[in-house]
Amino acid sequence: MTDQTLRLENVSPYLLLILDYFEKNCINKTDLFSIQGNQENVNRIISNIKNFTPTKQFEKDLNRGLYSRHDLSFSIINILNSLNHPLLLENYNEAYIVNAYYEDIERIKQTLLELPHSNLEIILKLFSTFNLLCNQEEHKSFLLLSPEMLGETFAFVLMRFKKTKDEVDQFGNKIFATNVISYLISHFNEIFDSTILDFEQKEKKSRENAILFMEYAMRKYTSLDNHFKSIYNKYIPHKRDLSQEDVQTIKTEFNLRKYSGKSKIRPPIPIYM
């Protein structure tokens, strides 16, 4: 049984690097998910992620060709299987199944946009890779890289259901999940184009807000740091043992500056929308 302990926020930087490399170097091959990768290499990739290997080193290993395309394809499956929650969160299963069945693209978009940003970021990249795989000219007659076969391969990787011993229920869940994944791949351009725009706008706004807040925090920190340095340089270098009078002077000066600064105009705190 797969150890489902990986957290997506920890995995994302590594998985995005793998998918990016995979998309650039491996999608012109037809045997990607039909041949098992080297288990030792797959385990090494998982171990490097768990041990928080620096992403630059991780990327360097990829670019050195340390892993084969089969190592990477099965690592993608293993990583997704090891997440503590699936990419397509369980509480949205019914929405995906019903909307895919009725081919309601707008509702599928809305459901996707309700996912956390970290989930949506990986989903966008993963299905972009699937779309490119299925649309390679040399793959169009190759059934193993059709939306239906990729849907079957990733059905229980991307979606999870309540455990059941009933074989009919298991089979039904597999059919539902396969249909959802293959539908998302087949209608990638219709579903994900506007979703990507909405997502990127949100991400851009979040990044801008984060930068504004960090700049504000840095100004506050620098101002306070300079204040304490000026007091330190004024008294500490000249006297190893501070007298009671020195201590009182420092306290007084600190308080005077503290309260005198209240009347100054300060930059507004960035508001997150």
Curated annotation (Swiss-Prot):
One of its GO terms (molecular function) is GTPase activator activity. Keywords: Cytoplasm, GTPase activation. GO terms for biological process: signal transduction. The keyword Cytoplasm applies. CDD domains: RhoGAP. One of its GO terms (cellular component) is cytoplasm. Residues 1-192 form the Rho-GAP domain. It holds the Pfam family RhoGAP. It is found in: Cytoplasm. The keyword Nucleotide-binding does not apply. The record marks S34 as: Arginine finger. InterPro entries: Rho_GTPase_activation_prot, RhoGAP_dom. Rho GTPase-activating protein involved in the signal transduction pathway. This is Rho GTPase-activating protein gacB. It comes from Dictyostelium discoideum. The lineage of its organism: Eukaryota, Amoebozoa, Evosea, Eumycetozoa, Dictyostelia.
